[in-house]
Swiss-Prot record:
<dbReference type="InterPro" id="IPR002347">
    <property type="entry name" value="SDR_fam"/>
</dbReference>
<comment type="similarity">
    <text>Belongs to the short-chain dehydrogenases/reductases (SDR) family.</text>
</comment>
<dbReference type="InterPro" id="IPR020904">
    <property type="entry name" value="Sc_DH/Rdtase_CS"/>
</dbReference>
<dbReference type="InterPro" id="IPR036291">
    <property type="entry name" value="NAD(P)-bd_dom_sf"/>
</dbReference>
<keyword id="KW-0560">Oxidoreductase</keyword>
<protein>
    <recommendedName>
        <fullName>Glucose 1-dehydrogenase 4</fullName>
        <ecNumber>1.1.1.47</ecNumber>
    </recommendedName>
</protein>
<keyword id="KW-0520">NAD</keyword>
<feature type="active site" description="Proton acceptor">
    <location>
        <position position="158"/>
    </location>
</feature>
<feature type="binding site">
    <location>
        <begin position="11"/>
        <end position="35"/>
    </location>
    <ligand>
        <name>NAD(+)</name>
    </ligand>
</feature>
<feature type="binding site">
    <location>
        <position position="145"/>
    </location>
    <ligand>
        <name>substrate</name>
    </ligand>
</feature>
<dbReference type="GO" id="GO:0047935">
    <property type="term" value="F:glucose 1-dehydrogenase (NADP+) activity"/>
</dbReference>
<dbReference type="GO" id="GO:0047934">
    <property type="term" value="F:glucose 1-dehydrogenase (NAD+) activity"/>
</dbReference>
<comment type="subunit">
    <text>Homotetramer.</text>
</comment>
<dbReference type="Pfam" id="PF13561">
    <property type="entry name" value="adh_short_C2"/>
</dbReference>
<dbReference type="GO" id="GO:0042802">
    <property type="term" value="F:identical protein binding"/>
</dbReference>
């Protein structure tokens, strides 16, 4: 646990399910004030809010579409109005869907880029604007992926969004480091989240994915949440501009694990 996270105001986009929910609950355990953004499932968001409160934190929910500038502005302003400030912005909302690249429509491409990359930029921009204007040494955490460095056939739009996020985060980190504002990525590997539930329920598909992970198991959302808590804390005060992978070693060329090559 990180005592300095108590009463910190943390905004999480896509915070009602999956990795976002796990992070919301972890910050609840840290006794933070959590702003849970959700897209359209209010019941799910209210359940997440209750879980955060039961964990020891405070929470509000804010509906919004991260691809819409006005919604992201409203999200940040609502957090500030409700809790008086902003300390940590976590841009977690994301989408993915497999399509052969030669069949990928422009609408599909735009949906993924707009959600994963533009949404993260808008969240980063609004948070940093507030930090700069109020001389706050704030913290931005962007949810990237192992696919910011590993090519992913059938997911060219997703891989492009995460590759773009890598350099966006590094650029923002460099630009605002003199003001004490830290910007980092988390790069999850394969995770036991609702979006993967059907796939991992199939023993064959699960074993295939596990074979690509040197540590041999699919990650738990709580393991990503632990990384987020670390990056948000003063224990990471000298850390900026990195991607911290929580991937069980997936990015470390697992095919070479047995000495092959």
């Amino acid at each position: 646990m990180y005592t300095d996270l108590k009463d910190k105001v943390v905004v999480i986009t896509g915070g009602s399910t999956g990795l976002g929910r796990a992070m919301a609950v972890r910050f609840g355990q840290e006794e933070a004030k959590v702003v849970i953004n959700y897209y359209n499932n209010e019941e799910e968001a209210l359940d997440a809010k209750k879980e955060v409160e039961e964990a020891g934190g405070q929470a509000i929910i804010v509906q919004g579409d991260v691809t819409k500038e006005e919604d992201v502005v409203n999200l940040v302003q609502t957090a500030i109005k409700e809790f008086g400030t902003l300390d940590v912005m976590i841009n977690n909302a994301g989408v993915e869907n497999p399509v052969p690249s030669h069949e990928l429509s422009l609408d599909n491409w735009n949906k993924v880029i707009d959600t994963n990359l533009t949404g993260a930029f808008l969240g980063s921009r609004e948070a940093i604007k507030y930090f700069v204007e109020n001389d706050i040494k704030g913290n931005v955490i962007n949810m990237s992926s192992v696919h910011e460095m590993i090519p992913w056939p059938l997911f060219v739009h997703y891989a492009a969004s995460k590759g773009g996020m890598k350099l966006m985060t590094e650029t923002l980190a460099l630009e605002y480091a003199p003001k004490g504002i830290r910007v980092n990525n988390i790069g999850p590997g394969a995770m036991n989240t609702p979006i993967n539930a059907e796939k991992f329920a199939d023993p064959v598909q699960r074993a295939d994915v596990e074979s690509m992970i040197p540590m041999g198991y699919i990650g738990k959302p709580e393991e990503v949440a632990a990384v987020a808590a670390f990056l948000a804390s003063s224990q990471a005060s000298y850390v900026t501009g990195i991607t911290l992978f929580a991937d069980g070693g997936m990015t470390k060329y697992p095919s070479f694990q047995a000495g092959r090559g």
